[in-house]
Amino acid sequence: MSSVTIGKCYIQNRENGGRAFYNLGRKDLGIFTGKMYDDQIWSFQKSDTPGYYTIGRESKFLQYNGEQVIMSDIEQDTTLWSLEEVPEDKGFYRLLNKVHKAYLDYNGGDLVANKHQTESEKWILFKAY
C-alpha cells in the first residue's frame, strides 16, 4: 500500500474534485466542490483493529450504519474503514466500511455508501498542514 496520510487531512473525490466536510454547528455532513474551508479537515487515524482507520472531525467519527453515512459520538466497528488501493489511479483509494462492506461514495452533495464499485468512490487523502 502506498503511503497514507495519517493525521489532519482533506478527503477529496477523484470524480468531481469535491472534499468531504462536517460542520458540527450546522450538523451538516457532505461533499463540497468549491473553496477549501476548515470544516473539510479530518483526522485520519489508525484504529486498534489492524488494517482499519477512523475518520473523525469535531470529536465525532464518520460512520455508515447500514442505511446512511452519519457522524457518531462513539468509535465502534461501524466507524472503521479500510483502504483499497485503486491500481489504475495512483494515490487514490476506496474507503470500505468494516461492518457493512460498503464503499464511501457521494450523491449530489451528500456522502453515501454502496456495495458496488463505481468511479465516484475513489478518494485521495492529502495533508491539511
Swiss-Prot record:
> How is it applied?
This protein has potential for the detection and control of certain cancer cells and cells of the immune system, that display asialo-GM1. Has potential clinical applications since it recognizes glycans expressed specifically by the target antigen for Guillain-Barre syndrome (GM1b), natural killer (NK) cells and basophils (asialo-GM1) and glioblastoma multiforme (SSEA-4) in vertebrates.
Q: In which tissues is it expressed?
A: Highest expression in the outer part of the mantle rim. Highly expressed in gills, with a much lower expression in the digestive gland and posterior adductor muscle. Scarcely detectable in foot.
Residues crossing the lipid bilayer are: none
Q: What is the effect of changing D39H?
A: Loss of hemagglutination
Tell me the residue numbers annotated for binding a carbohydrate: F21, Y22, N23, R26, K27, D28, F32, Y37, D38, D39, Q40
Q: Record's superkingdom?
A: Eukaryota
Q: What is the effect of changing Q12R?
A: Loss of hemagglutination. Loss of homodimerization, but retains saccharide binding
Q: How is its activity regulated?
A: Hemagglutination activity requires divalent cations such as Ca(2+). Hemagglutination activity is weakly inhibited by monosaccharides such as D-Gal (25 mM), D-GalNAc (25 mM) and D-Fuc (25 mM) and by disaccharides such as melibiose (25 mM) and lactose (25 mM). Hemagglutination activity is inhibited by bovine submaxillary mucin, but not by porcine stomach mucin or fetuin.
- Whether Kinase counts among this entry's keywords is no
**Annotated effect of mutating F126K:** Loss of hemagglutination. Loss of homodimerization, but retains saccharide binding
A GO molecular-function annotation: carbohydrate binding
- Protein's UniProt name: GM1b/asialo-GM1 oligosaccharide-binding R-type lectin
* Species annotation: Mytilisepta virgata
